[in-house]
């Protein structure tokens, strides 16, 4: 399994069990599902065995987003102005990270991130925002939106702000 970690905060953001897809060579999109969990349950992306199916209804059951729940992502809020201020600082941090670690990616990141940021701004009202578990204000803010069907949630992670760790 590969864990996708934020290069700034080192928070776990996702894993390959959720089949991230690269979009525009600048972000990962991860389709999510709404699941029901009882207090204390953790979903790591594996399919439960049919033999382990639980019967009955528990009053402590909540409906949650599987990726948000599994990686303990924390909901946060932005207005457009504060998000753009955050994004400018975050992009600078990622550019510095790339300059030190992957200098060949800096140009691709700058072009792709600028174009994708315009898409975000154009559809700003459609997004919910999530930080990693540590809630590091300098770390990645993942974006949650819904597919055209209006019911399938998906998360967006900045590709260049992710490092892959095999476990």
Curated annotation (Swiss-Prot):
InterPro entries: Mss4-like_sf, Mss4/transl-control_tumour, TCTP, Translation_control_tumour_CS, Translational_control_tumour_p
Cellular component aspect of the GO annotation: cytoplasm; microtubule
GO BP annotations listed: translation
Keywords, comma-separated and alphabetical: Cytoplasm, Cytoskeleton, Microtubule, Protein biosynthesis
Cellular localization per UniProt: Cytoplasm, Cytoskeleton
Chief site of localization: cytoplasm
MF-aspect GO terms: calcium ion binding
Domain TCTP: 1-167
SUPFAM superfamilies assigned to the protein according to its UniProt record, in alphabetical order: Mss4-like
Record keyword Hydrolase present: no
Cytoplasm keyword on record: yes
Database matches in Pfam families: TCTP
Function field: Involved in protein synthesis. Involved in microtubule stabilization.
PANTHER family in the record: TRANSLATIONALLY CONTROLLED TUMOR PROTEIN-RELATED, TRANSLATIONALLY-CONTROLLED TUMOR PROTEIN
Family in the record: Belongs to the TCTP family.
Listed name of the protein: Translationally-controlled tumor protein homolog
The species this protein was found in: Yarrowia lipolytica (strain CLIB 122 / E 150) (Yeast)
